Amino acid sequence: MVLLDSLVGTIVGINGPVIKAEGMSKFKMREMVMVGKKKLIGEIIILENDLATIQVYEETSGLKIGENISSTGMPLSLKLGPGIIGNMFDGIQRPLKKINEISYGFIDEGIGLISIDEEKEWDVNIVVKVGDKLKPGDVYAEVQETNIIKHRIMVPQDVNGEVTKVKESGKYNIEEKIVTVKDGGNIYELNLYQRWPVRTPRPIKNRLSLGKPLITGQRILDMFFPIAKGGTVAIPGGFGTGKTMTQHQLAKWSDADIIVYIGCGERGNEMTEVLEDFPKLIDPKTNTSLMNRTVLIANTSNMPVAAREASIYTGITIAEYYRDMGYDVAIMADSTSRWAEALREISGRLEEMPAEEGYPAYLPSRIAEFYERAGYVENLNDTEGSVTVIGAVSPAGADFSEPVTQNTKRFVGAFLGLDRKLAYARHYPAINWLTSYSQYNVMLTDWYLENISEDIIELRNKMLKILFEENKLQEIVKLVGEDVLPDDQRLILEVARILKVGFLQQNAYHDEDTYVPKEKQYKMLKAIELFYDNAYKCVKMGIPISKIRNEEIFGDLIKMKYNIPNEDISGIKVIEEKISSYYEELIEQYRK
């Protein structure tokens, strides 16, 4: 990165991460600058005549008034190339492993804008030849980045022309020029990376309708509140309701090709847990370590607040880059509330007029900007890819009426509200089936009918209806007890208990239960439905509920999630046969 010596400003005010400087008339809005003697990384966020306001992405302790501001001549941007997958970055794409080697556990000020490894040599397969016409987005080389991710090197947005020179396939680092393209009088030498400004969405050819689900292996999501590839999801919940655990489960088991996990303003221990767990976990699709498809962006609560604001954009830009190669990417942002708090803090230091609860008036548009970068798209190189955004929201006191939750709700397609009462009752995932919803149910209907069963929609609605009825009946039970209810309503309570404990509750630490294939999920629901239909028939014949309630069958239905292996679900058939024969015999006895 070259500093432009001709452009120099002077610091005239310091307020935490916000710097005021003069002599800035030739600088540009959103330009990345180097601040002070330590060359701290900053970004111009307000430019008025000669005065500029700069937000600094590093600790500003020790800066003095009168120190210089240098120009880099480019916006805050990322280096996009091989070496991103399996790596862990801070909020502005500086690799934490490398920083650890330099400064031993602490991020020193002025460490510079280091990024992906420039010296590592990659096995590069060049897929173009002299005379080929190239346009933006075309693939001109391929690198096997991990054993499951093939990194496609694409033509940058400003390059268009004919290939005039090509190196042979072989070992190259990301800085070496491997292809030369001529466009009229312009000659472009292409290497293995490109730069992209974080706040600008990457271009696409077309947005496509959402029609494929993101299979997560979590029963409540896949069966009741499905997520579409390219969709947007909010997971709001108070302290201790399991937001991070739910995000970890989605990052581990969802069938996206690549996961970008952003720890935005959360505890450092949680990122440590990800770093310790993911390399040990095996991806069920590829039988290799989960780190081979994961990018981690760690911007913990004690890191500079301005970098927290940038980390969300860093994550989504990396996700879009891999989407452009034709991959399905899922991005986990934990938590967007901390990001909104960073906006609030910077807004306060800028002395902007606060809106509701002190958040800036532009909070809704910033949240929309982020979620609108999701989607299932046709790329410039005619491949299809998707970015699915799953954002955790941490409302203070589990108050869902606060601004971040309410504004997020406006822009997402699925809302998975976590419930304190469920969490305190140790029902995890604590997703409340009464307040949660997914608008993707309708969009994904065709896929579910084709790939699971023709009765799946009917079955899902029937089970949800039982859960809603049980909620109404609980009000009566609390007042007068269960015994006064008629038997058909008591049956609803029993079936809902099986559904809640045996189906909706899922153990993230159990080998069989942490991830459940969709076929087993469907068969489990069918077994519960078979029990309900047979038991309902008995109730209508006047058979007392005490006879209908068979503890052995109840136990089998509740424990089938643990006892029946995911690879061989024939055990569910045995349970169904037991249900059918027991209730047929019961009906025969009462007919006599």
UniProtKB/Swiss-Prot annotation:
It is an enzyme of class 7 (translocase). ATP binds at residues 237-244. Its EC number is 7.1.2.2. GO terms for molecular function: ATP binding; proton-transporting ATP synthase activity, rotational mechanism; proton-transporting ATPase activity, rotational mechanism. Keywords: ATP synthesis, ATP-binding, Hydrogen ion transport, Ion transport, Nucleotide-binding, Translocase, Transport. NCBIfam families: PRK04192.1. Belongs to the ATPase alpha/beta chains family. This is V-type ATP synthase alpha chain 2. It comes from Clostridium tetani (strain Massachusetts / E88).
